[in-house]
UniProtKB/Swiss-Prot annotation:
A motif (Histidine box-3) lies at residues 361-365. Its main location: plastid. It is a peripheral membrane protein. This is Omega-6 fatty acid desaturase, chloroplastic. Belongs to the fatty acid desaturase type 1 family. Residues 1-63 form a transit peptide. Chloroplast omega-6 fatty acid desaturase introduces the second double bond in the biosynthesis of 16:3 and 18:3 fatty acids, important constituents of plant membranes. It is thought to use ferredoxin as an electron donor and to act on fatty acids esterified to galactolipids, sulfolipids and phosphatidylglycerol. Its EC number is 1.14.19.23. GO terms for molecular function: acyl-lipid (n+3)-(Z)-desaturase (ferredoxin) activity; omega-6 fatty acid desaturase activity. A motif (Histidine box-1) lies at residues 165-169.
Amino acid sequence: MACTLADSLLLFKGSYQKPVLRRDIAARYSPGIFSLNSNGLIQKRFRRQRNFVTRNKVTVIHAVAIPVQPAPVESAEYRKQLAEDYGFRQVGEPLSDDVTLKDVINPLPKEVFEIDDVKAWKSVLISVTSYALGLFMISKAPWYLLPLAWVWTGTAITGFFVIGHDCAHRSFSSNKLVEDIVGTLAFMPLIYPYEPWRFKHDRHHAKTNMLREDTAWHPVWKDEFESTPLLRKAIIYGYGPFRCWMSIAHWLMWHFDLKKFRPSEVPRVKISLACVFAFIAIGWPLIIYKTGIMGWIKFWLMPWLGYHFWMSTFTMVHHTAPYIPFKYSEEWNRAQAQLNGTVHCDYPKWIEILCHDINVHIPHHISPRIPSYNLRAAHKSLQENWGQYLNEASWNWRLMKTIMTVCQVYDKEKSLCCLRRTCP
């Protein structure tokens, strides 16, 4: 599921060449003239040169060469206007097809890939203490301050997810067994099965923004969007007020069905599922026994919903920009998908600390092996070497309003993504 940030066509597969039936006609056309039609779609037009006809012969006046004008997304002025309109600091310049991911990785300092056990366990300490503080705040807060306590606790427990996230990418410790244990324990309070998520998330990184293949993010298909009024309304409301909790649907859909995994993965998946169900079978009754149903809502459910707010919001912001290339596998470019197809966003400092810089997302997609505590140094290097290609933003109301009210619709017949407003 994806959304985009403009009211016009922002992604197109390539210049459309009008079919020419005869060779003598081909000489009368000059390619490279772009225009904007009444629907706001960019199209390539052809200027026909007139033939001067006499009774005896036909003289063809050949076209004068006209420089090809850049598509709007390649225009610095256009990208600057998009950034201003939709809350971005910068909309990245499209990356050339001949750039490889290795070209992007090579300039990164070697130290950003190094694992530091002290820093890794420091992040665990931050998450555990901030979560414990949140539970204490919930226990002591009067009813009118409970929302603030839930916001803090939900954000703190999101840090647990980021720790498990590093473990899954093998960037937490040099010991894989330690990573699997820590990752499983970090995911258990979220009732998120660690191994199923790891398998599916690895595929997301391997096939980022690849149509039909990416397990985390893709546009809505036009035929689905327009198929029936009922389904269209379901998509509209799903992409509207409930969008900040859509990760719950993703969690249910992708991580509990054994048929979605390879036979070699199933044993590890079963272990993770057993751990999650053990937490439900033991943890939930214990919470209810000590605090009652309202205590379960206060101490577990509300922070869990807060976590899913951040899970959904981070994912939406990371993968939404005015120019995100979605392509089929035969046209997909790894460097474009990871550098052009992801977004860096700055949040209030306390959120970045509790969530271990998960918002510094572009270097994480360039190489998932970079530990969370080295992402800022890696991003600084990317800014120095590839700065003009980066999508960057600061979290703001304009950005969130756009993400909540516009979705990206892919038209497979035209091989392009256009934008549909889903909410007023």
